[in-house]
Amino acid sequence: MPHTHKITPQEALQRTIEHREIFHDEMLHIMRLIMSGEMSPVMMAALITGLRVKKETIGEITAAAQVMREFSTKVHVADKTHLVDIVGTGGDGSHTFNISTCSMFVAAAAGAKVSKHGGRSVSSKSGSADVMEALGININLMPEAIAKCIEEAGVGFMFAPNHHPAMKNVAPIRKELGVRTIFNILGPLTNPASAPNILMGVFHPDLVGIQIRALQRLGAEHALVVYGKDGMDEVSLGAATIVGELKNGEITEYEIHPEDFSMTMASNRALRVETPEQSKAMLLGVLDNQPGAARDIVILNAGAALYAANVASSMQEGIVKARAALESGAAKARLAQLVSITQTLAA
């Protein structure tokens, strides 16, 4: 339906109170007010809380993600074949080591190009940026330098605050509210390198269907959105994993189980860490191909990423390739390469 006037923040708030949707064009306008700093902090806090209580729709999420992409500092990767993001919404409260960060080195060693988009810890003891720094990777590179990392090492890390400067208007409000808001689910939808393929972990089963449909509307090519039934925002080793898959424009939803891939089930308790240093130690153990639950869950997730990146024709084949990349030492070599390149480019 056409709208003759631009919706005001007050009208948008009233919609959320009445549990009515904010339409696409309206949400674009509201989100631009937020990102440009034109909305007052009080109004912003009320509106993002109202959206959360109402439950954000796929349309609202898609429009908000489009605006976040508009305002972002992009990384231009010339060849997007096999380019994939491995990302989680975070906030799953499982306090595990950085599984997606470790998986990216394995996926890169097996032929994917990984443009990893992440930040500091949300609710975990160690966010992807925290462990990257502990590993000696410089996370504050210019976009051209990150593109070079992706082209040369097959992997690059985009530190979210550097690519979403407009988020500074929202950051203090998110921090003070202390609850999940639409921004927790927007981060993974706004990859600055526009990776066409994605493996995304989410913190709630309802988000599987929502995020895969948002990705479809945002033009993703091959995407897997996963939720481990033990609460993990990863492909889980401790329970079945709900998967939403977008491929060739079609969405399918199904469940996978560790035993489908001849994996021994293990509780995620074995994967818990307290600090970025502990996460780093566990990650290095995996890259040294040390047997155990940590290695198995990385193989599962790297396998899923290789399937999403179209390097493997199935998750099963992805797992075989991921295991080989660890056994050969190629995954560990990718980490050394990224450390070296980021230090050189930062100099």
Curated annotation (Swiss-Prot):
Annotated positions binding anthranilate 2: 174
UniProt-annotated binding residues for anthranilate 1: 88
GO cellular component: cytosol
Residues engaged in binding Mg(2+) 2: 233-234
Keywords: Amino-acid biosynthesis, Aromatic amino acid biosynthesis, Glycosyltransferase, Magnesium, Metal-binding, Transferase, Tryptophan biosynthesis
Binding of 5-phospho-alpha-D-ribose 1-diphosphate, residues: 88, 91-92, 96, 98-101, 116-124, 128
SUPFAM superfamilies, sorted: Nucleoside phosphorylase/phosphoribosyltransferase catalytic domain, Nucleoside phosphorylase/phosphoribosyltransferase N-terminal domain
Alphabetical list of InterPro entries matching this protein: Anthranilate_Pribosyl_Tfrase, Glycosyl_Trfase_fam3, Glycosyl_Trfase_fam3_N_dom, Glycosyl_Trfase_fam3_N_dom_sf, Nuc_phospho_transferase
Single annotated GO MF: anthranilate phosphoribosyltransferase activity
Cofactor binding description: Binds 2 magnesium ions per monomer.
GO process terms (BP): L-tryptophan biosynthetic process
Pfam families according to UniProt: Glycos_trans_3N, Glycos_transf_3
Pathway(s) served: Amino-acid biosynthesis; L-tryptophan biosynthesis; L-tryptophan from chorismate: step 2/5
Stated family: Belongs to the anthranilate phosphoribosyltransferase family.
Self-association and partners: Homodimer.
Annotated protein name in UniProt: Anthranilate phosphoribosyltransferase
Organism (species): Polaromonas sp. (strain JS666 / ATCC BAA-500)
